[in-house]
Each structure stands twice: as structure tokens, then as C-alpha cells.
Curated annotation (Swiss-Prot):
Coiled coil: none annotated. One of its GO terms (molecular function) is translation elongation factor activity. Associates with the EF-Tu.GDP complex and induces the exchange of GDP to GTP. It remains bound to the aminoacyl-tRNA.EF-Tu.GTP complex up to the GTP hydrolysis stage on the ribosome. InterPro entries: EF-Ts_dimer_sf, Transl_elong_EFTs/EF1B, Transl_elong_EFTs/EF1B_dimer, Transl_elong_Ts_CS, UBA-like_sf. This is Elongation factor Ts. Belongs to the EF-Ts family. It comes from Chlamydia trachomatis serovar A (strain ATCC VR-571B / DSM 19440 / HAR-13).
């Protein structure tokens, strides 16, 4: 039987900001004494972290990893750019990627509950508290994504600005087109498309754009309106859709043209299945 009440456990969690498991451990070690439990957590480097949890976090890093387990992406924020480049913080972020891949998670709350691959005796939430204590700043895991990688897929990752923006591209038809996938990922970071293709643009977006275009040519003859509207839609697709965009490294060819050229050269049926683009704080 425990030597402490649920009320004491609740008070310890509120006072320290430390996770449930470690608070139980502390109270068991302290035989139910709240003050001794706080001291125990402080010795572990956990207790003072809770005081930092309400500080604003505007800096940080977006990190990505792909291996035989799949592909993972995580955004982790801190207070200053100095800590964002700190080796301890970066190691914590790298560990999160491995945790996402191990557990196939895209949920931040679920990630916080799993045991850390870096420090198996601690949950991710508890290791975050230890890392906060070490770097002296608040840390917030903002978002996470796990995506399985199928056989016959190539995945390209491009990171810009030391992790301020990251794109990940999933290319089907070959496992040997990482360079092409990375080139497309680099293009995505530079051009920031909203959609993959014309067919993937939601109907409500098309209707909104048509309404805007129509208002711009109100009063003109119908055939003129149609011609102008078609031209405006073409320009919209070229700006908003990845496959319609001019390749940043060779504007004479579209991204679809680039893929077709590579497919012809390799004899492989290459296709961009989907992409992910994250920008810090967006």
C-alpha cells in the first residue's frame, strides 16, 4: 500500500510540474513526505523544470529522419536561438525522432507518455523536464508526424536555415531516387506550394478563386470573361500546385516535367505521392 494520498500526489505534481510516474517514485522514496519528495526530484534535476513551462517559446528546430522504420518529423520550440543550437537540446530532438519511429506516433501527447529511447528509465515528458533543467529554458514539443515508407519509395528531405523550414517528399516507383526527391524537397522549401496537383485543390478553393476572378472582370463579354478566367486559373495552378511549378533550379521545366524526364531516363514509373512542408511556428 502507498504511504501517500492522491491529494499529496496531486500537490507534488502541481508544485513541480513533473510527470505522474516520477512523482509516485519520489513519494515512495520519501515515504509520503511532500518536502522530501520535492528534494528527491530536485536531485534528479526534475523539480524546477515546471517553473519554466509558461515561458514563451518562439525559437527551436524542425527535424526529420527517415530509415527502415519509416519517416518522422518533429517541431520542438525553445526560448532562444542560442539554446536551439545547443548540443544537449539537439540530442533531445534527435531522440524524439527515434521515439516517433519506434512507436509509429503522430500525436504529441502520446509521444510524451512513451519511455525515451535516450534514457529508458524516463518517459519523454520526464526527459524533457531534465533537458529543460540542463539548458535553462522552456521546451515545447509543438507537433510530430510519423509516416510509413513502402517498398519502392524514395524519400527526400531538405532542411533550410538550420531547421527553420523542412520539406519531405515521398516519391513512388523507385527506391533509388533519393537525390531527385531531395531536389524536389529543396524546391518546396523555396517555392512553398499549397497543393500537390491541380486535382488535389479542394473544390471550395476553386470556387473561391473563380469568384475572385469573376469580380475582377465584371462587365466584360462572357467569352472574354471565360478566356481571362482560364488564364488566371493557369497562373494560380502554376503558383499553388507543386507539379505545375517551374523547377527552381531549371525554370524551363516544371516539377512534373522533371519527374517525367527522370522516369524516362530510369525506365521507372516515378510519381510524387505526397509531400510535407513545415515552417517554424506555422
Amino acid at each position: 500500500m502507498s504511504d501517500f494520498s492522491m491529494e499529496t500526489l496531486k500537490n507534488l505534481r502541481q508544485q513541480t510540474g513533473v510527470g505522474l510516474t516520477k512523482c509516485k517514485e519520489a513519494l515512495e522514496h520519501a515515504k509520503g513526505n511532500l518536502e522530501d519528495a520535492v528534494v528527491y526530484l530536485r536531485k534528479l534535476g526534475l523539480a524546477s523544470a515546471g517553473k519554466k513551462e509558461h515561458r514563451e517559446t518562439k525559437e527551436g528546430v524542425i527535424a526529420a529522419l527517415v530509415d527502415e522504420r519509416g519517416a518522422a518529423l518533429v517541431e520542438v520550440n525553445v526560448e532562444t536561438d542560442f539554446v536551439a543550437n545547443n548540443s544537449v537540446f539537439r540530442a533531445f530532438v534527435t531522440g524524439l525522432l527515434s521515439d516517433l519511429l519506434d512507436h509509429k506516433l503522430s500525436d504529441v501527447e502520446a509521444l510524451a507518455r512513451v519511455m525515451s529511447s535516450q534514457e529508458p528509465s524516463l518517459s519523454v515528458e520526464e526527459l524533457k523536464a531534465v533537458t529543460m533543467q540542463t539548458v535553462g529554458e522552456n521546451i515545447r514539443i509543438s507537433r510530430a508526424l510519423y509516416t510509413p515508407v513502402s517498398s519502392g519509395q524514395s524519400v527526400g528531405i531538405y532542411s533550410h536555415g538550420n531547421g527553420k523550414a523542412v520539406a519531405m517528399v515521398f516519391l513512388s516507383g523507385s527506391e533509388n531516387q533519393e537525390a531527385l526527391a531531395k531536389d524536389i524537397a529543396m524546391h518546396i522549401v523555396a517555392s512553398q506550394p499549397q497543393f500537390l496537383s491541380k486535382d488535389s485543390v479542394p473544390q471550395e478553393v476553386l470556387e473561391r478563386e473563380r469568384e475572385v476572378f469573376s469580380s475582377q472582370v465584371a462587365g466584360k463579354l462572357q467569352e472574354v470573361v471565360e478566356k481571362i478566367t482560364q488564364g488566371k486559373f493557369k497562373a494560380f495552378f502554376q503558383e499553388a500546385c507543386l507539379l505545375e511549378q517551374a523547377f527552381i533550379k531549371d525554370p524551363e521545366v516544371t516539377i512534373q516535367g522533371l519527374i517525367d524526364r527522370a522516369a524516362k531516363a530510369s525506365g521507372e514509373p516515378l510519381k510524387v505521392e505526397h509531400f510535407v512542408f513545415w515552417k517554424m511556428g506555422a
